[in-house]
């Protein structure tokens, strides 16, 4: 069933809303560093938030190109790359991350952009402070 009110919509789309704000934060740092694009490690279909439809919803908030070199890779290929570039050990640390915390019982594979934007409108009062806090407390790791 589809959520009928904004609170229910917000709950159902929590992960997508979070991913959209993560994209905004990433774009902030990319602009600050003079980058012309973002690069992510997403792979199509690995998780519910990485369907083509949901990736388009995530992209919608970003004003620069988003490249996904792992888009067609399977999990083992991505693990091999992570080991090669030195990010694998960090990726398996036993901490709850945003995706773990916001896992819905029944993940949405085809988000509704109109409802997501309506839910985001209800967050505007607090989100600016939270984004500033996230930006100010971000640790930048340079990968070679």
Question: For the regions a protein language model found, what residue spans apply to each?
Answer:
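Single conserved hydrophobic/aromatic residue that forms the stacking wall/gate
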Residues: 1-9, 13
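Short acidic, glycine/serine/threonine-rich loops at helix termini
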Residues: 10, 49-52, 113
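Active-site adenylate/phosphate-handling loop in enzymes that bind or generate adenylated species
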Residues: 15-85, 130-143
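A generic structural signal for well-ordered coil/turn residues at beta-strand boundaries
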Residues: 34, 95-98
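Short catalytic/ligand-gating loop segments at beta-alpha or beta-beta junctions
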Residues: 41-42, 93-95
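A short alpha-helix-loop-beta-strand transition element characteristic
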Residues: 86-94
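A charged, well-structured terminal subsegment
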Residues: 98-113
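Flexible C-terminal active-site loop/helix
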Residues: 109-141
């Amino acid at each position: 069933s589809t959520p009928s009110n904004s609170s229910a919509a917000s709950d159902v789309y929590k992960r997508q809303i979070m991913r959209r704000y993560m994209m905004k934060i990433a774009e902030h740092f990319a602009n600050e560093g003079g980058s012309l694009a973002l690069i992510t490690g997403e792979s199509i279909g690995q998780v519910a938030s990485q369907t083509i439809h949901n990736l388009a919803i995530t992209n919608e908030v970003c004003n620069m190109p988003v490249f996904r070199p792992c888009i067609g890779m399977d999990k083992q290929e991505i693990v091999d790359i992570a080991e090669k570039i030195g990010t694998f050990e960090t990726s398996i640390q036993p901490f709850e991350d945003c995706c773990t915390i916001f896992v819905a019982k029944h993940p949405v594979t085809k988000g509704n952009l109109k409802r997501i934007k309506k839910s985001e409108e209800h967050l505007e009062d607090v989100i600016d402070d939270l984004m500033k806090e996230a930006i100010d407390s971000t640790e930048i790791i340079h990968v070679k």
